[in-house]
Amino acid sequence: MSLFTFNPKSARIALSHKRLADAYRRVPGAEIPVVEPGARAPIPDGTDLEKLDDFDRLLHDAVAWANGLAAGDNDWPPMINTLCGVVFVAEAFGCQIVYGEGDVAWTKPVTMDIADVWKIKPMKVGESPLIRRLSQWIDYAQRKLGTDVPTWTMDLQCPFSVAAHVVEPTELLAGCISDPKAVHHLCQMVTDFSIEHMRQHLAEMEHPSFPGRNFPSISENVGICIADDTPLIMLSPQMYREFSLPYNNQIGEAFGGVHVHSCGDYRHNIDNLLQITNVRSIQAHAGPGEFPLPETGSEDCPFNRARRKVACFVDTNGLARGHYRTDARRHYSEYVLPRVFSGDTTGIILQSCGTGDGVPDTNAALAWTRREVGKRKTNT
């Protein structure tokens, strides 16, 4: 008996896939997908200490999330959760995994000295504990659930971000000035490992979904997600071009497309990001508290240059809302939607407004957001 409460081949799920595929391809005049990843059930924590050793608990949470995604008028299709990949490649380079508040996985650096990178060698791909556990989980989930529902591909961390785990971050940044050859050596090692690891990861899934974690995903191979938080935020445009862009380019070339996740305000590096080989989309936590959007679509600014070239997944959270923190609908009606609809909406993917401010649950948030999108599309 299936554990799923939905038909994976339903017309509603097929419609979600079409809307997202059109957005990622930037089809003019296509419907704007309205998505909510936390519908009915939260995204499972993929590196929870207890659940890593209990695949039945991981399975329960993965099924609950997929059922929740399918339960409402949601353009985020149901999928099987994998594991959050923030620390995976860093562990393979020797980082010790530590768990902080809320059992969030992080790392201890391998070294405090940039000169040590010449002595660092990664494990063979597939042999580090977390990557091996990820492979085992994918195999277990596919045997238990079948493959009609796609598996969410993992979030590959960009090479410079991994380097900032391996070498203490301040030392790594100083090394960009004092010993750039060592920084490039480490980033190239991480790039080579990451490409081989991601190819292995994709080969393990009979039905992967793309671009993967952080993004609403579809069965069509539109490229992979890279999480680019550290360099996009921390590096100047000049340093990003030297120490991050060449390695992201190699990943974009290898997989035919990249979709860039980053938290925070990375507007100063958007023009660099748009130079990544085969970049397909970006994610922005939109709001005055995190990633401010321009007031109009005609303004000459990095975000508007991005929206004319790639798809844009516009989402939000409590931090991004800033002074709208408890006013979910007002944040969207006064801030996000007027700015999104002041320009071309081709390629826009929009998360729901969220709960609070009279919005009792995620289904209500989806319904309200979809109505507001419909009104604005009618008036443009």
Predicted regions and their residues:
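N-terminal beta1-alpha1-beta2 module of alpha/beta enzyme domains
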Residues: 69
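A contiguous, low-structure linker/loop signature
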Residues: 81-119
